[in-house]
Amino acid sequence: MTRQYWLRWFSLHGVPRVVLRVQSRKGDTFARMMGPEGIADPHPYIETIRSQGRLVKTPLPWVTCDHALVRSVLRDDRFGVRSSARIQIPKVLQRFANRVPPPANPADPPAMLRMNPPDHTAMRKPVVSAFTPRAVKKLRDTVETVTEELLDAMPSGGSIELVESFASRVPIAIIFDILGMPREDQEKFLAWGKDMTPMLDVGISRRTYGRAMQAAQSLNDYLDRHIEKLRREPGDDILSNLVQSGDLDHYALKANASIIIGAGFETTANLIGHCVSLLLRLPEQLDRLRAEPQLWPNAVEEALRYEPPVFITARQALTDLELEGVQLPQGSMVMLSLAGANRDPAVFTDPQRFDVARPNANEHLSFSYGVHACFGASLARMEATHAVRSLFERFPDMRAAAPPRLRQQLTFRGYAQVPVHLGRKVQVTPSTVA
């Protein structure tokens, strides 16, 4: 990592990392939730924060786990996402970090995750066209084909690790089709994505940040070549359309392509992993799905509620404002626990229970809300529903081979490994699992 990037890491992650450790030792609940204990099981910390009020002050940001308040902040145009920092840091460090531009990546401007209207609106509009319900419906055949190919390759009676061999493979194949990229390059992108997603966490290590920067640079180099190719030979895909439209400059094209790639497969892979792990752990819920297969879409909504692929997000006050009777000066950061909102007892009965028939499971906030709501939500739902149902119908005796292992990340919360014994393979026609 170059000296410039080391200083950027120090500004955005090094200082918060030290502060979080110090506050964790002092027993601060938020700091402990953001550390190794919280990654392993964040919910005791969430409930402690919830018991302290709807909006809770910590030594770093404000925090809320309240469903109504999280939803309100997400749609409030007095809040935005302009800061590159994930928690509040001194202005001098923020200014310095902004003077050291990183390779285009999903975590920094001009990526849509870090833009506000009207710039965000202008960048989002041409991308959303690839993810409308009508466009997603057209992708269903591709999702079914990719899923069946992966399941066909799995050995009857064998043991595999599902994240690497299945959960990540379905969404990356679909994203590659959307972006007009050759499938033989998927392995590179899976590796780059694995290294880059920690950039969205708080206080990552210097080594982790260095790997992320290397992956971001490799992705940039690839996208430079791919975008130039699309200028000469455009295809029938969203990235070709963006290149040919001229609406985005070259750097913005790369930043937003990296979002489509990263968010497009990382969140869906996490969702598939959570669905499989939950159903293996709770066989009575799987039995109900077998008896009532019409519940499969709702089961995916409940998995989104119970284990959201994105655990927490943040918003920054764009002006002096009042929230819950508290005066927040401009620049104040509010951490929004999507996982906490999704288990708010004011909204969900018996919220700590996973129930595939929960009548209001779809009231979760796992895909965010407001102007930054996930534009790929319909696609993620469709992919996960088909992939998970097909997996369990092809391998009805599948069971866990070992406890699943979580990634050491909190923002994008998912499994690094889900080892399973597949058991016998059953041949199922695509129409049966449609």
Q: Where are the predicted features?
A:
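Cytochrome P450
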Residues: 1-434
